[in-house]
Regions:
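Bacterial N-terminal signal peptides that target proteins for export
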Residues: 2-15
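Bacterial N-terminal signal peptides
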Residues: 14-24
């Protein structure tokens, strides 16, 4: 599989925010499921815990006039914005935005925001808010504007759900609020972006203004609950561990990522639940690396995976499967998939760093001081097990349970990711193999546990 050509277009963080306001992309429309009342949630004891106003039918004619007026003023830029946010499920664009923001944080403040996994908390908020929204849709049974006034011609095909509240506004309120918390330096831009996403649905003729206003409030309320939950899980204290001083273990000026060993898991019983056995002596594997001959393929794989956090590759792949299997208009199911994946990744961060700082597995360039990694650097934390290998294996395993017909492809991609770290000269084979194995166990555990609830 040529993953390099499959995932070619990437965007810088700041341009991405501008891009979100202007790009126009369209996809085929498909009906979506509307029922959320049987789905358990992460932060809501009950989906009815979050309250929004009941639609006021006395204002119906006024709101219809507002929809028509809004549509009459659409500019080409408005049309592009409508098409952009209409692509896929409401969570689709927000996951694209979130992985760009999160991936850029790896080298900022010792990766603290990156390790906190903002995408996990965002997708939990989106999922819970969507469950609540689908319940309220069933309770209110509000028709969409064009169903009441046949003179309204929508710009896009409307979702096959009731109108109130707007699922895009619910998602935008949840996503933008959570991301604004994790990225305070661009909070205003994110909230403005979210408001634009929500309001695009009125301009498209598929929602009433109150659908959007109350939908945003719903998402915002759920986001606040998720943020409070994150504060209880993302404990940040100075790391008090001691580094081994002998030449057989990793050593570094600062233990990057060690803070994640103090995070509270969402699914695992403890951070060491999937800790692998201690690593072997790497002397023989160092000889294997010294004798390894690069070729075009191995070098390209090394650079490809080194250039990405993995969040982008796996998120894009999951999204493409949702489109491929015509799930992209099932708002709740797509929210569920994104949540499953990203909770798996959050658990992986904790498990990976637990093992790394339990064993201080040495890196090749520390075992052999003459060794030069192909990609020009070595990550600033212990090597065993490989984080890329384990995290990719977790996601590959979860996606294999959701899309079993594609299991071979997911597993092959995870192996390519793992192998690339050896090609890059920064991981021994055991780092990668153990990472793949531990990731599969963790992925199966996360899916089996959460699938009973969601």
């Amino acid at each position: 599989m040529n993953t390099n050509s499959f995932y070619s277009q990437k965007f810088a963080v700041v341009p991405m925010l501008v891009f979100c306001l202007t790009l126009s992309i369209g996809f085929a429309q498909h009906p979506e499921s509307a029922r959320g009342d049987k789905s358990q949630t992460f932060v809501l004891a009950d989906s009815r815990e979050v309250k929004i106003a009941t639609p006021d039918n006395k204002l119906l004619q006024r709101e219809l006039a507002q929809v028509k007026e809004k549509m009459s003023k659409n500019t080409p830029a408005d049309s592009q914005r409508i098409s952009y946010w209409d692509a896929g499920a409401p969570a689709y664009r927000w996951n694209q935005i979130a992985y760009q923001l999160t991936g850029a944080q790896f080298e900022v403040n010792n990766g603290l925001t990156f390790f906190k996994s903002p995408m996990t908390w965002m997708n939990m908020a989106i999922y819970d808010a969507t469950v609540a929204a689908m319940d309220i849709k069933q309770q209110t049974s509000r028709k969409r504007p064009f169903e009441i006034d046949k003179s309204i011609k929508t710009v896009v095909a409307a979702p096959a759900t009731y109108s109130y509240p707007c699922e895009h506004a619910v998602t935008a309120g949840a996503a933008a609020t959570v991301l604004a918390y994790f990225f305070p330096e661009i909070a205003d831009s994110l909230l403005t972006l979210g408001k634009g996403a929500a309001e695009s649905r009125v301009a498209a003729g598929v929602q009433f203004p109150s659908d959007v206003a109350e939908g945003w409030k719903l998402g915002e309320q759920v986001a606040a609950k998720v943020i409070e939950k994150s504060k209880n899980h993302l404990t940040v204290m100075p790391w008090n561990g001691k580094q081994p001083s002998d030449a057989k273990h990793w050593r570094g000026p600062y233990p990057v990522g060690a803070v994640a060993t103090m995070f509270k898991p969402l699914v695992m019983k403890s951070g060491d639940q999937f800790r692998p056995a201690a690593p072997p002596d790497f002397t023989k594997e160092m000889e294997q690396m010294n004798n390894f001959k690069q070729n075009f393929y191995t070098a390209s794989q090394a650079y490809y995976w080194a250039a990405h956090s993995g969040l982008d590759i796996w998120t894009d792949l999951a999204s493409s499967k949702m489109f491929e299997y015509h799930m992209d208009r099932n708002t709740l199911e797509c929210a569920r998939i994104y949540a499953l994946m990203n909770i798996g990744l959050y658990e992986a961060v904790i498990a990976i760093m637990d093992a790394k700082y339990a064993y201080f597995g040495i890196r090749p360039d520390q075992l052999n001081l003459d060794h030069k990694p192909l990609i020009g650097y070595t990550p600033p934390f212990p090597g065993y097990p490989s984080g890329h290998a384990m995290a990719s294996s977790v996601v590959a395993t979860i996606l294999s349970r959701i899309f079993p017909q594609d299991e071979a492809m997911f597993k092959q991609l995870a192996k390519e990711c793992a192998d690339s770290r050896f090609y890059a000269g920064i991981h021994f084979p055991t780092d990668n193999n153990v990472g793949l194995d531990a990731g599969e166990k963790l992925g199966n555990y996360v899916f089996a546990t959460l699938n009973k609830q969601m």
